[in-house]
Amino acid sequence: MITPVPQHNSLEGTPLEPAISSLWSTAKRIDTRVVRGRITRAVGTLIHAVLPEARIGELCLLQDTRTGLSLEAEVIGLLDNGVLLTPIGGLAGLSSRAEVVSTGRMREVPIGPDLLGRVIDSRCRPLDGKGEVKTTEVRPLHGRAPNPMTRRMVERPFPLGVRALDGLLTCGEGQRIGIYGEPGGGKSTLISQIVKGAAADVVIVALIGERGREVREFVERHLGEEGLRRAIVVVETSDRSATERAQCAPMATALAEYFREQGLRVALLLDSLTRFCRAMREIGLAAGEPPTRRGFPPSVFAALPGLLERAGLGERGSITAFYTVLVEGDGTGDPIAEESRGILDGHIVLSRALAARSHFPAIDVLQSRSRVMDAVVSETHRKAASFFRDLLARYAECEFLINVGEYKQGGDPLTDRAVASIGELKEFLRQSEDEVSDFEETVGWMSRLTS
């Protein structure tokens, strides 16, 4: 009788054994099958396809072997007899012969420190002619917001170099604030000032649905070579597909999260939140969602908090975020303006009337508010800002009488002081685009005006 020779594992009992066992266990779970499907319908910005085992958010390739066409698409819905895909890009050249190939991957963002100083699109492709973009890792496009119980509280001011903001609407490090204004209300001017003056280590700018002319103008004139060194600009112009425009905002946020995890102070400027929501509306309506307020489907209002809550303070670094919102008039009835105000930590309201009088930045101080200001400024600063606002309010109440020559001095001492000092108050609030004001000097000037 022959006795079997026992198999001896040469790694047994060595330090490598646990690692090898873990790798072997993982390898056995890997599915190496390539799942393929076919297109059944393609209309507008939506593709119907048969694709077994597809998941919401999964990336697929649309491939036509005869023409060599290869397009990326994302699964956005599941049907009884197939899936809904939205292409990342246009549908030009797509035919009924194209195969749908599952990649098994969700949307990811290539990231690395070498992205600083670059202008890229939402898929990390270079737009600045500086060659290939070098990245070191990837992370999910749709990250999770920090745990509310581990998120640090906003306790320090975040100087912006803009007197009206630093003095009267002081922002805190890690705050999220909306900038609300009509077209032509001075949003670009204010964004330019914030980019230049923000006390940040890294600046991330997302330009969503902008005109192509304005993108180059912003990068070269407003940001400049010096500002671009610490910045990354993510661009999807108005001619790009809804999927690309919708991807721009979470892409910029993912970049900001990467630098926050390095312990850095990040300023995130997203222009505009309205155009992001419009792109989401295009996708949602094409997928058959019911229109609700102003034609926006429910998925838009679900996506907003998921995007906005990702900014703020982390365990180490911070993302101080500014989101522009396009409104008509005072924004009453605008669902995006109303929804975002309920989520964000403050709002800056821009006045077209001030912009028409060449009063820049065109901030309507009395209609604006920073919800964290009291937590990040001294009592002296808070009192000076409160009195400054009182003077502006008193002048606003009697401005009509002054203009028609009916105002009479002596009725109220505070109103008389407001009228006498309005020139100095406006001088404080006005600031040229290239001027960056020191935070302490701003507070000192405001204190002298209100003493």
Swiss-Prot record:
<dbReference type="GO" id="GO:0046961">
    <property type="term" value="F:proton-transporting ATPase activity, rotational mechanism"/>
</dbReference>
<keyword id="KW-0067">ATP-binding</keyword>
<keyword id="KW-0963">Cytoplasm</keyword>
<dbReference type="InterPro" id="IPR004100">
    <property type="entry name" value="ATPase_F1/V1/A1_a/bsu_N"/>
</dbReference>
<keyword id="KW-0547">Nucleotide-binding</keyword>
<dbReference type="InterPro" id="IPR050053">
    <property type="entry name" value="ATPase_alpha/beta_chains"/>
</dbReference>
<dbReference type="Pfam" id="PF00006">
    <property type="entry name" value="ATP-synt_ab"/>
</dbReference>
<dbReference type="InterPro" id="IPR000194">
    <property type="entry name" value="ATPase_F1/V1/A1_a/bsu_nucl-bd"/>
</dbReference>
<comment type="function">
    <text>ATPase component of the type III secretion system (T3SS), also called injectisome, which is used to inject bacterial effector proteins into eukaryotic host cells. Acts as a molecular motor to provide the energy that is required for the export of proteins. Required for type III secretion apparatus (T3SA) formation, proper protein secretion, host cell invasion and virulence. May play a critical role in T3SS substrate recognition, disassembly of the effector/chaperone complex and unfolding of the effector in an ATP-dependent manner prior to secretion.</text>
</comment>
<keyword id="KW-0813">Transport</keyword>
<dbReference type="GO" id="GO:0005524">
    <property type="term" value="F:ATP binding"/>
</dbReference>
<dbReference type="GO" id="GO:0005737">
    <property type="term" value="C:cytoplasm"/>
</dbReference>
<protein>
    <recommendedName>
        <fullName>Type 3 secretion system ATPase</fullName>
        <ecNumber>7.4.2.8</ecNumber>
    </recommendedName>
</protein>
<dbReference type="GO" id="GO:0030254">
    <property type="term" value="P:protein secretion by the type III secretion system"/>
</dbReference>
<dbReference type="InterPro" id="IPR040627">
    <property type="entry name" value="T3SS_ATPase_C"/>
</dbReference>
<dbReference type="InterPro" id="IPR005714">
    <property type="entry name" value="ATPase_T3SS_FliI/YscN"/>
</dbReference>
<comment type="subunit">
    <text>The core secretion machinery of the T3SS is composed of approximately 20 different proteins, including cytoplasmic components, a base, an export apparatus and a needle. This subunit is part of the cytosolic complex. Forms homohexamers.</text>
</comment>
<keyword id="KW-0614">Plasmid</keyword>
<feature type="binding site">
    <location>
        <begin position="184"/>
        <end position="189"/>
    </location>
    <ligand>
        <name>ATP</name>
    </ligand>
</feature>
<dbReference type="GO" id="GO:0030257">
    <property type="term" value="C:type III protein secretion system complex"/>
</dbReference>
<dbReference type="InterPro" id="IPR003593">
    <property type="entry name" value="AAA+_ATPase"/>
</dbReference>
<dbReference type="InterPro" id="IPR020003">
    <property type="entry name" value="ATPase_a/bsu_AS"/>
</dbReference>
<dbReference type="InterPro" id="IPR013380">
    <property type="entry name" value="ATPase_T3SS_SctN"/>
</dbReference>
<dbReference type="GO" id="GO:0016887">
    <property type="term" value="F:ATP hydrolysis activity"/>
</dbReference>
<keyword id="KW-0653">Protein transport</keyword>
<keyword id="KW-1278">Translocase</keyword>
<dbReference type="Pfam" id="PF18269">
    <property type="entry name" value="T3SS_ATPase_C"/>
</dbReference>
<keyword id="KW-0843">Virulence</keyword>
<dbReference type="Pfam" id="PF02874">
    <property type="entry name" value="ATP-synt_ab_N"/>
</dbReference>
<dbReference type="GO" id="GO:0008564">
    <property type="term" value="F:protein-exporting ATPase activity"/>
</dbReference>
<comment type="similarity">
    <text>Belongs to the ATPase alpha/beta chains family. T3SS ATPase subfamily.</text>
</comment>
<dbReference type="InterPro" id="IPR027417">
    <property type="entry name" value="P-loop_NTPase"/>
</dbReference>
<dbReference type="GO" id="GO:0046933">
    <property type="term" value="F:proton-transporting ATP synthase activity, rotational mechanism"/>
</dbReference>
